[in-house]
Amino acid sequence: MNFQGLVLTDNCKNQWVVGPLIGKGGFGSIYTTNDNNYVVKIEPKANGSLFTEQAFYTRVLKPSVIEEWKKSHNIKHVGLITCKAFGLYKSINVEYRFLVINRLGVDLDAVIRANNNRLPKRSVMLIGIEILNTIQFMHEQGYSHGDIKASNIVLDQIDKNKLYLVDYGLVSKFMSNGEHVPFIRNPNKMDNGTLEFTPIDSHKGYVVSRRGDLETLGYCMIRWLGGILPWTKISETKNCALVSATKQKYVNNTATLLMTSLQYAPRELLQYITMVNSLTYFEEPNYDEFRHILMQGVYY
């Protein structure tokens, strides 16, 4: 359905005039609105993923909470957007859910493609640190992102040095009342996320915990450097079991993974991925140590 021209009424009774379609993904379509600072994200209510996003926005992404966390951690920027409003729209046969969220600029995937599918190591390390800061905030609220990738990382409209991790349709609550979720498989959750970057735990049906997001970020950084992961081509065939088995083969062979993907082994990624692979499912990572490792790649 094309929503352009429709007037949507949100939960606060404000009205939004839907403009042209500017993006479409696995978790909804994105349209401009009559306010250039915001976009509206729409999908059928029955799909459920936008409700997951709405819940995450309202429970976790409160500006006051983010600001307080930044001050307490001495971190200048947390790349998470907030939700202006939400609501429901009913057509003749289908009911839709919509969110009104901040409008951003181009995504990192477009930037990488414009640079011949390769970014300088310094840029990759800086992006890695930004995403690490962002997922640390999420993790300390008890949530994992579950779908880190270049197309879900978006530049600010004005300040191109600010990045935002978007699309919260696969967020998972791995902590509740101070208790970590148990290490139990759910066959319905197997292979969630983007196959090329899905963490091994998710392939097996476990809830993505902190180590899963860090694992995915490692795969992404290899790709951003221009590497081709050993399972990249397999991912295109949607052979989930073979992708999972191939990833598992490299868990204790980080140097081989890097040499196969990049034809060289950047010291920072070797240390980063090795440290990620040493984490247990329940373990809280030493984010400062991960930041320190990536920062070495910024200056050397």
Swiss-Prot record:
It is found in: Virion; Host cytoplasm. The keyword Nucleotide-binding applies. InterPro entries: CK1_Ser-Thr_kinase, Kinase-like_dom_sf, Prot_kinase_dom, Ser/Thr_kinase_AS. GO terms for molecular function: ATP binding; protein serine kinase activity; protein serine/threonine kinase activity. GO terms for cellular component: host cell cytoplasm; virion component. Keywords: ATP-binding, Early protein, Host cytoplasm, Host-virus interaction, Kinase, Magnesium, Nucleotide-binding, Phosphoprotein, Serine/threonine-protein kinase, Transferase, Viral release from host cell, Virion. Its cofactor is Mg(2+). Its EC number is 2.7.11.1. The active site is at D147. Autophosphorylated. Interacts with host JIP1; this interaction increases the amount of MAPK bound to JIP1 and subsequently increases the activity of transcription factors, such as JUN, that respond to these complexes. Interacts with protein OPG198; this interaction inhibits the repressive activity of OPG198 pseudokinase on viral replication factory formation. Essential serine/threonine-protein kinase that plays different role in the viral life cycle. Phosphorylates the host small ribosomal protein RACK1 thereby customizing the ribosomes to a state optimal for viral mRNAs (which contain poly-A leaders) but not for host mRNAs. Facilitates viral DNA replication by inhibiting host BANF1, a cellular host defense responsive to foreign DNA. Phosphorylates host BANF1 on serine and threonine residues; this leads to BANF1 relocalization to the cytoplasm, loss of dimerization and impaired DNA binding activity. This is B1 kinase. It comes from Vaccinia virus (strain Copenhagen).
